[in-house]
Swiss-Prot record:
GO biological process: taxis
Family designation: Belongs to the asfivirus MGF 360 family.
Role noted for this protein: Plays a role in virus cell tropism, and may be required for efficient virus replication in macrophages.
InterPro entries in alphabetical order: ASFV_MGF360
This protein's name: Protein MGF 360-21R
Provenance organism: African swine fever virus (isolate Tick/Malawi/Lil 20-1/1983) (ASFV)
């Protein structure tokens, strides 16, 4: 295991211990404990009485409570690599300890992550095991771990459009690859609405715009979500649904948005964005880096006497 490509690519030490316990590898269990792994993590995957006895000898508890299980989840997912995400899925997504309905907080975390992404299925109608699988798949796309993406893509083709949906939310590069690879039942405007439900998601908003999505619908979604920076980006791209957006802002008593939208006569499209006309994700991400990109119309608004 230590000499394997997966270990060299990077595994969280406690996750490696869990794998060694699953494989009943006494030598590796003792080695990983010597290196500093927590023997209690082994209780997640122990499957023989001999290894359970070894875990006890090494100081393990009899069982983990729901908060300790939550700590296991947070600890092993913190390490970012393709193989770490794949192994997290393989060890946890069908693990009875993690599927227990007593793990209320874990279920809330997973449901929160998947809530915006569940645009072509009903979240409450799928099993928690599937939710966990979709969660790890989404992380692979979010961090652009190509090996993990291919692993999930090949193994879970029945998750209709899931890779595309995650790309819209997190990853312009993978969105571009999968959107041009296969047909989708998801309308480009639906993709744009999803993109606008994530703050500072400029590259994916721009990509959907270049693919023909309605920028006014994007502007409306940004107002509904109260995402001011996305709103200004939509205005930069030529959105002009000010009356409808102003009505929404007034109905929700969002006075900050009312003030922004009231300056509609000051705003105009940003020609530098509109002239690029590309779907090349590298060019888009270079242009719209969230640390360097500044909205032309946001700067105009900040320059008014009423800001």
């Amino acid at each position: 295991m230590i000499k394997s490509a997966s270990f060299k690519d990077g595994l969280e030490l406690n996750l490696a211990l869990m794998k060694a316990v699953q494989e009943n590898n006494r030598g590796l269990i003792e080695l990983f404990i010597e290196w500093g792994a927590d023997i209690n993590f082994g209780l997640i995957t122990v499957n023989t009485e001999n290894i359970r006895s070894l875990c006890r000898e090494l100081g393990a508890k009899e069982a983990l409570n729901k908060w300790e299980l939550l700590n296991v989840f947070y600890t092993v997912k913190r390490f970012k690599s393709s193989n770490n995400i794949i192994l997290c899925h393989e060890l946890l997504s069908n693990n009875p300890l993690f599927l227990s309905e007593n793990n209320v907080q874990l279920r809330r975390i997973i449901n929160y992550k998947l809530k915006n992404l569940s645009i072509n299925f009903i979240l409450d109608e799928i099993s928690f095991s599937e939710k966990l699988t979709r969660f790890w798949y989404a992380l692979a796309v979010e961090y652009n771990f190509t090996e993990a993406i291919q692993y999930f893509y090949q193994k879970y083709k029945h998750f209709k459009d899931w890779r595309l949906i995650c790309g819209v939310a997190y990853n312009t590069f993978d969105l571009h690859e999968i959107y041009n690879k296969e047909k989708t039942d998801i309308d480009i405007n639906q993709m744009m609405e999803l993109a606008c439900t994530y703050r500072y998601n400029y590259p994916n908003i721009y990509y959907c715009f270049m693919m023909g999505a309605d920028i006014n619908r994007a502007m409306i979604t940004s107002v509904i979500k109260s995402y001011i920076y996305n709103l200004f980006f939509c205005i930069d791209l030529g959105a002009d649904a000010f009356e409808e957006c102003l009505e929404i802002a007034e109905q929700t008593n969002n006075f900050a948005l009312v003030k922004i939208l009231s300056f509609k006569n000051y705003y105009s499209p940003d020609s530098s964005l509109l002239s690029l006309k590309t779907t090349d994700p590298e060019k888009i991400n270079d242009l719209l880096d969230d640390e360097t990109y500044e909205s032309k119309n946001l700067l105009i608004y900040e320059g008014t006497d009423y800001y």
